Amino acid sequence: MKVTYHGHSVITVETKDHHIIFDPFLTGNSLTDIKPEDVKADVILLTHGHNDHVGDTEQIAKQNNALVIAPNELAVYLGWKGLNVHPMHIGGSRQFDFGKVKLTQAFHGSAITDEENKTITYTGMPAGILLTVEDKTIFHAGDTALFSDMKLIGELNHIDLAFLPIGDNFTMGPEDAKLAAEWLRAKQVVPVHYNTFPVIEQDPEAFADSLPGGVGKVMSVGETIEL
């Protein structure tokens, strides 16, 4: 299984038979290395409805006939746009042909903002996502604050790779993310959601170096690791 980082919170997972993408914010993402028209994906996983996470979901889903898996209200909203969706909710899990998906808590917001019409559409609760494929588990925390039940997530799951936001301001910052990494007990921790905008500028290397046992890893944009 190949896992690639594409800037901000965009992650792709490639298996023998499937191409999966998390939170495909590409248009307007100054850090990304890919364009929406070039994305090959049969599954799109969304943590919440903010524009910098839903991103190019509609275009990618339609050009690939991809399945979009998202928290319930967000899935319903995207279904109304003609996308093939599967709604889930916090604590729920489901086995799909590509692997198992489970949604966890995330402490954040979730809404789609239309700047032109000055409207905000509520899209339910935000989530983290546990993806288990080929006996490996990836945890994408989405946008979140630190919360104590991360200990429980770590106790109940053997996490091989965790993606944690460190940007601060809108999510937890490096200090809280360090504690999250400890509680989650992941074998490897990669920082995300930083340096896309001035307000979330951080030093990812300093964060990775602060984690004990060499579990911290900074993935450069376009870098791939194998699990």
Swiss-Prot record:
Disulfide bonds: none annotated. It comes from the Bacteria. It holds the Pfam family Lactamase_B_2. GO terms for molecular function: hydrolase activity. Keywords: Hydrolase. The keyword Hydrolase applies. PANTHER family: UPF0173 METAL-DEPENDENT HYDROLASE YTKL. Belongs to the UPF0173 family. This is UPF0173 metal-dependent hydrolase YtkL. It comes from Bacillus subtilis (strain 168). The gene is ytkL.
